[in-house]
Amino acid sequence: MPKYRSHTTTHGRNMAGARALWRATGMTDDDFGKPIIAVVNSFTQFVPGHVHLRDLGKLVAEQIVASGGVAKEFNTIAVDDGIAMGHGGMLYSLPSRELIADSVEYMVNAHCADAMVCISNCDKITPGMLMASLRLNIPVIFVSGGPMEAGKTKLSDKIIKLDLIDAMIQGANPNVSDEESAQIERSACPTCGSCSGMFTANSMNCLNEALGLALPGNGSLLATHADRKQLFLDAGKHIVALTKRYYEQDDVSALPRNIANKAAFENAMILDIAMGGSTNTVLHLLAAAQEGEIDFSMTDIDRLSRKVPHLCKVAPSTQKYHMEDVHRAGGVIGILGELDRAGLLNRDVSNVLGLNLTQTLEAYDVMLTQDEGVKQMYAAGPAGIRTTKAFSQDCRYPSLDTDREEGCIRTREHAYSQDGGLAVLYGNIAADGCIVKTAGVDKDSLTFRGPAKVFESQDEAVEAILGGKVVAGDVVVIRYEGPKGGPGMQEMLYPTTYLKSMGLGKSCALLTDGRFSGGTSGLSIGHVSPEAASGGLIGLVQDGDFINIDIPNRGIVLDVSEAELAARRETEEAHGDAAWSPKGRERQVSYALRAYAMLATSADKGAVRDKSKLGG
């Protein structure tokens, strides 16, 4: 029988000092011996997805205490990628993921906590906490802050749905008036919550449901809706039961590595492909798998991407549907139900409730369940009132979206495309692979050939795009923006956004060793591995070189002879210490970022630390 970790600090005369300090936090004699459960919050006033989390840890903690545990809350940092976008702040976004994972490990191990409830929401916070959970391998339940309501405004006598990306595109479009741009800006992000499309934050919160580490509804139930409160209460109650299953019943199936095993990781990736999730999810799943010592790689993602159809289309791939519409159609469980009926899921998986896949679908799939309470939960809708408060409204749709032929979620037979929403491409320029969000690519652009326009930084590319130096047919190549080369693997949302603003969104391609925001669409290919700073071929591309992109056949090739590439490599390596670094780029890089760069791996490994450099 495993021993409660917390007994290290609560039992024995030699721990009198530790107990004295525990007493100073409010613990009593009756508490020593109960499981100590960390409530890992991420409240901050910097991020709309986290601005409403201040009091939600208390909800979880009260339920933990009522269920027989001891709750101790602490906070992590949280970076808003949208606010950090387009300037030096974006260098810190991906490295913050490692910092969050480390800080959770530090707090939980330093104080010998027995289990965790992770209150996450936005882009790097959920992945960082997920990495920590699999690293620590103690009982955990995730409950996120929930999605933002979609923005809505009236333009040309028509009500349209909006999100952050619309504000960015229209703000850079010279054909949009200042008045219209301001109107869109004020309407795009109306409430607290993670941005309303299938961007990185919502993608990751959905994947946590598929991994089995979050409760049904977690990925899609709006932050503002009163029903979401129950998820926090249930997380507090169920984490105590989950913890006792492991420590008091020796049930190892309660541990995250046994819930989020390889089969669950495959299901999560299948879900991601089917819903056209953010390409960042590939990076984060690979990183989490490494922390959990799970054999899951780009090879698995490539294999899965070839057989999974695109069943759910959401902004930014369409403006018709946002997360509130996904929820109305049955949320994550609704998509999993269609995937299961298509015979695409691993069925031998479980979740933190102890339910297997069949039981979960019977209870929570709106196409199967007879539970009116579950149907009511999925009918939870937006109120359309600007607010930063959680659980502030209880509006409901008059009916669910169960149209699986033309609705938000579709059957395999009526899929948006028989090819999934993500694809892995290989070729000489990406020997270890690169990622494209096919859900956002125009059908006419699935094959593309064009001359390269090469830039050593995102900033240089943006200046050229807005300056009219990029024309239809070009392949914009942005390099030295990978985990090492950036450092920090910036998101290239501004270049893709400005290509759209300049009318080039469907006539140009963009290729980078950096990454993309979940809000990116168009022929945007990222995560090129190996990156330029690691000697990748992308570092040898020259202006005018032709690049062939073939998404249906999963290929990407720099059309330059092997002899010429060998000569270019020899010339580059002759630069010695200055080889494989950006030419003429001036960028202030702090020591914190330099430390990250020294240990960072390329994107095909999840951009995690190279453990071999640490003796691992």
Curated annotation (Swiss-Prot):
One of the record's GO molecular function terms: magnesium ion binding
The entry's Mg(2+)-binding residues are 81, 123-124, 491
Q: Which cofactor does it need?
A: [2Fe-2S] cluster; Mg(2+)
Q: Which residues form a coiled coil?
A: none
Q: What is this protein called?
A: Dihydroxy-acid dehydratase
- According to its UniProt record, which reaction does this protein catalyse? (2R)-2,3-dihydroxy-3-methylbutanoate = 3-methyl-2-oxobutanoate + H2O; (2R,3R)-2,3-dihydroxy-3-methylpentanoate = (S)-3-methyl-2-oxopentanoate + H2O
Where is the catalytic site? Answer: 517
Give an example GO cellular component term for this record.
cytosol
This protein's UniProt keywords:
2Fe-2S, Amino-acid biosynthesis, Branched-chain amino acid biosynthesis, Iron, Iron-sulfur, Lyase, Magnesium, Metal-binding
Q: Which GO terms describe its biological process?
A: isoleucine biosynthetic process; L-valine biosynthetic process
One short Pfam family name for this protein? ILVD_EDD_N
Please describe what this protein does: Functions in the biosynthesis of branched-chain amino acids. Catalyzes the dehydration of (2R,3R)-2,3-dihydroxy-3-methylpentanoate (2,3-dihydroxy-3-methylvalerate) into 2-oxo-3-methylpentanoate (2-oxo-3-methylvalerate) and of (2R)-2,3-dihydroxy-3-methylbutanoate (2,3-dihydroxyisovalerate) into 2-oxo-3-methylbutanoate (2-oxoisovalerate), the penultimate precursor to L-isoleucine and L-valine, respectively.
Q: Where does [2Fe-2S] cluster bind?
A: 122, 195
Entry's family note:
Belongs to the IlvD/Edd family.
The annotation note on the cofactor reads: Binds 1 [2Fe-2S] cluster per subunit. This cluster acts as a Lewis acid cofactor.
Q: Which InterPro entries match?
A: Dihydro-acid_dehy_C, DihydroxyA_deHydtase, DiOHA_6PGluconate_deHydtase_CS, ILV_EDD_C, ILV_EDD_N, IlvD/EDD_N
- Using the record's annotations, give every residue carrying the modification N6-carboxylysine: 124
Subunit structure of this chain's protein: Homodimer.
Entries under Gene3D superfamilies matching the protein:
IlvD/EDD C-terminal domain-like
Reported EC number(s) for this entry are 4.2.1.9
Broad class of enzyme this protein falls into = lyase
Lineage, top-rank taxon, reads Bacteria
Q: What is the organism of origin for this protein? A: Yersinia pseudotuberculosis serotype O:1b (strain IP 31758)
> Which pathway?
Amino-acid biosynthesis; L-isoleucine biosynthesis; L-isoleucine from 2-oxobutanoate: step 3/4; Amino-acid biosynthesis; L-valine biosynthesis; L-valine from pyruvate: step 3/4
Could you list the residue ranges that cross the membrane? Answer: none
